[in-house]
Amino acid sequence: MAKTSMIIKAQRGNKFKVRERNRCPLCGRPRAYYRKFDMCRICLRKLSNLGQVPGVIKSSW
């Protein structure tokens, strides 16, 4: 879980665009972020297993 200070720091605008980091809005995780779903891989997996992410289905072959 990300520290509260790091989440607040990421919300502030940076002087340089390159320094901005995408964060998961649910848990604040900065890594493994999926832009399409606007969340990290862990939250994406948790919510998709519950069926709360539209368009995501479990694959079977």
From Swiss-Prot:
> Which keywords accompany this UniProt record?
Metal-binding, Ribonucleoprotein, Ribosomal protein, RNA-binding, rRNA-binding, Zinc
Signal sequence residues: none
Q: What is this protein called?
A: Small ribosomal subunit protein uS14
A cellular component annotation (GO) from this entry: cytoplasm
**Gene expressing this chain:** rpsZ
- A Gene Ontology molecular function term of the record: structural constituent of ribosome
Which positions does UniProt annotate for Zn(2+) binding? Answer: 24, 27, 40, 43
Biological process (GO) annotations?
Answer: translation
The similarity comment for this entry is:
Belongs to the universal ribosomal protein uS14 family. Zinc-binding uS14 subfamily.
Q: Which cofactor does it need?
A: Zn(2+)
How the cofactor binds, per note?
Answer: Binds 1 zinc ion per subunit.
- InterPro entries recorded: Ribosomal_uS14, Ribosomal_uS14_bact, Ribosomal_uS14_CS, Ribosomal_uS14_sf
User: What does the record give as the function of this protein?
Assistant: Binds 16S rRNA, required for the assembly of 30S particles and may also be responsible for determining the conformation of the 16S rRNA at the A site.
> What does the subunit comment say?
Part of the 30S ribosomal subunit. Contacts proteins S3 and S10.
Transmembrane residue ranges: none
The family database entries (Pfam families) matched by this protein are listed as: Ribosomal_S14 (PF00253)
Top-rank lineage group of the source organism: Bacteria
